[in-house]
Design a protein with these regions (language model features):
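N-terminal amphipathic/basic leader segments beginning at the initiator methionine
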Residues: 1-22
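Alpha/beta enzyme core
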Residues: 2-3, 14, 26-32, 38-322
């Protein structure tokens, strides 16, 4: 049948009908809010390039998380650490008194209904800003795996619910899974940053986390933005190594990749709505060029419509307004 028998506008005639037939709806259970936790006390440093976000010491992180839960009902967070000191290998992140495990233990003492995802990478903890040990001017894959595995065990011991390796080393999921299992954490899931692209959208995050590389870039381990078949190979490898969830990062420029991954694999798909995507919205809204709340809603809906089961987003704290 076609027009005039079929009139597609009939199901758009009022808000109640539109809501009834809506195919995609974002809700609080879909969202994870990232936080940046910094060593020290009474620190609440505004992140200039990410309005409304802060570097928070543990004592300031706790009320911020409480506010997130109370206002929005979002009870899932992702933690990134900003340490007091760094080293050549990122070994500082493996210590039990490192900033993220310290924050996790503090949060565990306050919140019983909070899901904590711990990012696993070395870039915040190395003096050179790369994601692993440098040998001959490049990140050495296999020696880096040992650090990532040790870091994962430390965070699991501290109480992390989910381990999320973001380094893009080959074999990291298998190394982490083996280390977790050997230390009694066989029920701790791995959320792998499987298709993490060498993107220009990470700029504000690197300012926030102090993780910009001191030389070169990350194109020898993060993915080429031109490739999508490669993303499927990365996802397949991570699943075979034991990943429980897989991630595509960034989200907006890679909706096609999210869709391909969801269509190809029967596994939960996470999408990271990254700092540059967030900051573009904030900048445009500050200049009066867009309706901020409408655009945020549209972005999150498009990510879920593409196939994401879970969305990591700095907009999570604004969810109550959407």
């Amino acid at each position: 049948m076609s027009y005039p028998i079929t009139r597609l506008r009939r199901l758009r005639k009022n808000a109640i009908i539109r809501s009834m037939v809506r195919e995609t709806e974002v809700n609080k259970d879909d969202l994870i809010m990232p936080f940046f936790v910094i060593a020290g006390q009474n620190i609440r440093n505004p992140i200039r390039s990410m309005p409304g976000n802060f570097q928070l010491s543990v004592d300031q992180l706790i009320p911020e998380v409480k506010d997130l839960i109370d206002r929005t009902g979002v009870n899932k967070i992702l933690l990134f650490g900003i340490p007091e000191s760094k080293d050549e290998h990122g070994h500082v992140a493996c210590r039990e008194d490192a900033i993220v495990p310290t924050a996790i233990r503090a949060l565990r003492n306050v919140f019983s209904d909070l899901l904590i995802v711990a990012d696993i990478c070395n870039c915040e903890y190395t003096t050179h800003g790369h994601c692993g040990t440098i040998v001959d001017g490049d990140v050495h894959n296999d020696s880096t795996l040992k650090t990532l595995a040790a870091q994962s065990v430390t965070l699991a011991k501290a109480g992390a619910d989910i381990i999320a390796p973001s380094d893009m080393m080959d074999g990291r999921v298998a190394a982490i899974r083996r280390a977790l299992d050997e230390n009694g954490f066989e029920n701790t899931p791995i959320m792998a940053y499987s298709a993490k692209y060498a993107s220009g959208f990470y700029g504000p995050f690197r300012d926030a986390a102090g993780s910009a590389p001191k030389f070169g870039d990350r194109s020898t381990y993060q993915m080429d933005p031109a490739n999508s078949d490669e993303a499927l190979r990365e996802v397949r490898e991570d699943i075979m190594e034991g990943a429980d969830m897989v991630m595509v990062k960034p989200a907006l420029s890679y909706l096609d990749v999210i869709h391909r991954v969801k269509s190809e694999f029967n596994i939960p798909v996470v999408a990271y709505n990254v700092s540059g995507e967030f900051s573009m919205v904030k900048a445009a809204a500050a200049n009066g060029w867009i309706d901020e709340q409408r655009v945020i809603r549209e972005i999150l809906t498009s990510i879920k419509r593409a196939g994401a089961d879970v969305i990591i987003t700095y907009h999570a704290k604004e969810f109550i307004n959407l």
